[in-house]
Amino acid sequence: EFDPRRDTLWLTGDLVARGPGSLEVLRYVKSLGDTVRLVLGNHDLHLLAVFAGISRNKPKDRLKPLLEAPDADELLNWLRRQPLLQVDEEKKLVMAHAGITPQWDLETAQQCARDVEAVLSSDSYPFFLDAMYGDMPNHWSNELSGLARLRFISNAFTRMRYCFPNGQLDMYSKEAPEDAPAPLKPWFAIPGPVSNAYSIAFGHWASLEGRGTPEGIYALDTGCCWGGELTCLRWEDKQYFTQPSNRQKSLDEGEAVAS
């Protein structure tokens, strides 16, 4: 059991739009203060775009109670100041919602995270969110600049699943690895500077069902919003704890969309 007096809770992102309780989740996580370390996911960024008037609210995301709550401004301004990347040097542990592209070393990943975090926490955040949607560019270069650079960074941290062997992102395939078209590989199957030196925890990829990753790579999305389980990893002894979803496997397709 999580005890905020002695434990630190790491959350892999997508705090919202994964069930009916987005408002309650944000209020609870915010109340935990320094006892929680989280990263933003793609659904969190989409919520911020809705909040900024850039994207429309989809009824299937069930965000209306949150958007109409009296403390919505406080919660969402808090949310947009949360990080894309968590690093614990003592544990040699890195966490990002979708993972870490093999094209980056840790210093690059940290700088890239800071670039997007700085924009999100500024008054100009709507300009970034307006340009966030899109799949290109899909290959990292230090020469990338402006909104194209920020779009690649947010895609890599929050949407990535597959890469080409050269590390180029594929933003289309979502199936389990055994069904993926050649030559695509899961990002974690391509050796990179970060995965060679750190453990990596990530969410986002429900069809993995927590399986098939190399040693030191922890896939924690086990499809709770699709009728699977909510999975927690206790770091000290690497023991997993699961909570069955209270939703049926035969979900109405209109209720939630993984992306």
From Swiss-Prot:
Query: Entry's InterPro entries?
Result: ApaH (IPR004617), Calcineurin-like_PHP_ApaH (IPR004843), Metallo-depent_PP-like (IPR029052)
Keyword Hydrolase among record annotations: yes
Query: Which keywords describe this protein according to UniProt?
Result: Hydrolase
**E.C. number, please?**
3.6.1.41
Pfam families hit by this protein: Metallophos (PF00149)
- Give one GO term, molecular function aspect: bis(5'-nucleosyl)-tetraphosphatase (symmetrical) activity
Recorded catalytic reaction(s): these are: P(1),P(4)-bis(5'-adenosyl) tetraphosphate + H2O = 2 ADP + 2 H(+)
Q: Which family does it belong to?
A: Belongs to the Ap4A hydrolase family.
State the protein's purpose: Hydrolyzes diadenosine 5',5'''-P1,P4-tetraphosphate to yield ADP.
Name of this protein: Bis(5'-nucleosyl)-tetraphosphatase, symmetrical
Organism the protein comes from? Klebsiella aerogenes
